[in-house]
């Protein structure tokens, strides 16, 4: 048996646990939680063993278990192993958490069954070696998530969110099927590695560009990009383990799809430009709305909208290694944030503050941004001299500039007149650490995915325009946020806050346009 088939053991273990859960659906089913946790841990061990296979034997693909290009196959490379490790680790944590969280629920076994099914489907998706398996896993993931979102079927908000999610997922699946059909016509194969290899060496025909557009549409709908983001902010009625799995795992499927077909996407620069524009706007929109949310979970949901937008922006700029790194970092953070959300208020209240709240004036904000940019430029030059400037694409430098704007906001707090010296020193250290971390992680991600993901192409006039627009937009938003305390008491600020807290009513408008989202009251 090929060692590259080893990753298939992980979803098989979870499917076995799921079947056991469905057989014992009730309250406190004997051995079901234990078996589910053991299967999730076993999946993590399989992922670690798959990493060992990759290190010892290099990237490769298994043979097809099936016929005529239809069946199961595994693509083992840096992308799939990274996602395998991420999904199995978070899955194990979520299953372990759910064991206590749902203890005593009337349908505990039913929930565990669908939770394990969802994890198995995601694992089949990220290791798929052929497009048929990828589409089947894509659809199965959506179906399992729908069941989890309706775990409390009598909750009207849960019904509305699940119905809206199912609509966008169905359109996404249709777009993906269309893309796969065009890909098969263009390349005559269902093997993903062969498709990417041919896309890397061929020219972008209209069929390939159309396929890339359909892949982009599928990813946009799956990752809740503006204006289809509303359902993601409405799923708070589901149990916390579902929120953690959704926001830290399933929502990343759109980004993974773009990364997996990166070679094909690069051949359609116009499609990438649309992704960059939509992703950048979604990131800005989600971040601004997030700042106005009063509840922990809704704030985290809007944070996910913003992060998925930023990930889409990275894919649109052809920074696929950084997009993969973003998926890993965001998933780990967001899983912890949701599972720990119950104690968030107490944690914030217990934080020791070194002094009074520092409100920077305009001069402090300008100084902070200039210092942050100087730190970024200095550390970037140091990395360039060490590892070579040819590895620093303009797109990556522009993205790092956006990152440093967030650090500049913190630095402005440290430069305020009322800021104590420990705060000033700490924010300066944070700025330097963020710049070093960005360049180090970017270098590591590009090195690990070399030969698997395409290099970022040289930007043209359109790409330069998009980068300038993104940097200016995020810079203006960061400056406005830093200066907000100076005009927070103005009546216009209060009105703006109300409108932003309602997401500028975009979701309500979409509901009205689509219609049919009212859920009848229970009789």
Place the predicted regions along the sequence by residue.
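...captures the hydrophobic TM-helix bundle architecture rather than a specific catalytic motif
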Residues: 1-494, 498-523
């Amino acid at each position: 048996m090929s060692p590259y088939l080893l990753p298939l053991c992980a979803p098989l273990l979870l499917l076995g646990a799921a079947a056991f859960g469905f057989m014992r659906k009730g309250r406190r089913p004997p051995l079901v939680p234990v078996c589910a946790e053991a299967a999730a841990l076993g999946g993590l061990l399989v992922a670690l063993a798959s990493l060992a296979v990759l290190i010892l034997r290099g990237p490769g693909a298994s043979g097809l278990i099936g016929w005529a290009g239809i069946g199961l196959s595994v693509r083992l490379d840096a992308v799939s192993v990274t996602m395998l490790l991420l999904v199995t680790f978070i899955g194990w944590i979520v299953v372990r958490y759910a064991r206590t969280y749902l203890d005593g629920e009337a349908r505990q076994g039913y929930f565990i069954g669908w939770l394990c099914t969802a994890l198995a489907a995601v694992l089949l998706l990220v290791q798929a070696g052929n497009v048929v398996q990828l589409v089947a896993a894509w659809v199965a993931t959506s179906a399992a998530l729908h069941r989890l979102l309706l775990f409390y079927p009598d909750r009207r908000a849960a019904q509305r969110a699940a119905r809206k999610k199912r609509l966008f997922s169905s359109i996404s699946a249709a777009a993906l099927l269309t893309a796969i059909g065009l890909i098969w016509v263009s390349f005559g194969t269902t093997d993903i590695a062969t498709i990417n290899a041919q896309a890397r060496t061929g020219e972008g025909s209209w069929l390939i560009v159309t396929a890339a557009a359909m892949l982009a549409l599928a990813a946009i709908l799956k990752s809740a990009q503006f204006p289809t983001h509303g359902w993601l902010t409405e799923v708070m009625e589901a149990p916390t383990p579902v929120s953690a799995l959704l926001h830290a795992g399933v929502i990343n499927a759109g980004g993974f799809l773009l990364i997996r077909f990166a070679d094909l996407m690069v051949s359609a620069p116009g499609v990438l430009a649309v992704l960059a524009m939509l992703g950048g706007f979604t990131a800005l929109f989600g971040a601004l709305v997030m700042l106005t949310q009063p509840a922990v979970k809704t704030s985290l949901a809007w944070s996910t909208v913003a992060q998925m937008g930023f990930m889409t922006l990275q894919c649109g700029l052809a920074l696929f290694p950084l997009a993969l790194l973003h998926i890993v970092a965001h998933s780990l953070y967001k899983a912890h944030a949701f599972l720990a959300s119950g104690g968030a208020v107490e944690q914030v209240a217990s934080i020791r503050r070194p002094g009074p709240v520092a409100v920077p004036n305009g001069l402090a904000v300008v100084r902070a941004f200039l210092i942050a940019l100087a730190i970024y430029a200095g550390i970037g030059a140091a990395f360039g001299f060490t590892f070579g400037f040819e590895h620093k694409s303009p797109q990556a430098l522009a993205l790092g500039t956006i990152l440093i704007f967030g650090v500049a906001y913190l630095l402005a707090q440290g430069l305020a007149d009322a800021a104590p010296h420990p705060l000033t020193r700490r924010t300066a250290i944070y700025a330097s650490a963020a710049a070093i971390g960005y360049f180090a992680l970017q270098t590591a991600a590009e090195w690990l995915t070399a030969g698997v993901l395409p290099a970022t192409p040289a930007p043209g006039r359109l790409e330069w325009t998009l980068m300038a627009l993104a940097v200016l937009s995020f810079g203006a938003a960061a400056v406005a946020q830093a200066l907000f305390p100076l005009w927070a008491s103005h009546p216009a600020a209060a009105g703006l806050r109300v409108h932003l807290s309602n997401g500028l009513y975009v979701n309500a408008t979409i509901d009205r346009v689509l219609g049919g989202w009212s859920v009848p009251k229970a009789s």
